[in-house]
Amino acid sequence: MFTDTKAFSGFAAPDIDEARRFYGETLGLKTSMENDLLILHLAGGRDTMVYPKPDFTPATYTILNFPVADVEKAVDELTSRGVEFERYEGFEQDEKGIFRGEGPLIAWFKDPAGNILAVLEQ
């Protein structure tokens, strides 16, 4: 039924202008606006929609993962742009917030609304 449908995901934010600045300027993503919705244009022709929600509650899980060739370099660049990395109990993270346990190297951070994002080495 949906084999030829170009599905997309979406998530909420309380302030679309603030989200546009963060995703466009801080993260460097291409963005556009469609009917008061923020569209994030991701690599590979994928789009994600950010919609306004006044009674917003941040996601308690990772909503977007950004695969990178060098997670340490990405963390350093994001830190220089004012991004702060999260620390989670039960995960042994280094001084930069990078988890170097099982699986790929990964570091989590939040957008201005408190939604969880991650960079992971691929």
Where do the PLM segments sit?
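Core segments of cupin and vicinal oxygen chelate
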Residues: D4, G10-T48, P54
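N-terminal beta-strand motif that seeds the catalytic metal site of vicinal oxygen chelate
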Residues: M1-E18, Y61-L64, L120-Q122
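Short amphipathic alpha-helices within nucleic acid-binding modules
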Residues: F22, E72-E77
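Short, charged/polar surface micro-motifs in flexible loops or helix N-caps
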Residues: G45-D47, F56-P58, A69-K73
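Short aromatic/hydrophobic contact patches that present stacked aromatics
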Residues: F8-G10, I39, M49, I63-N65, ...
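Exposed loop/turn and edge beta-strand positions of beta-sandwich/beta-sheet ligand-binding modules
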Residues: E34, T60, R100-G103
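Vicinal oxygen chelate
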Residues: M1-F2, F66, V75-Q122
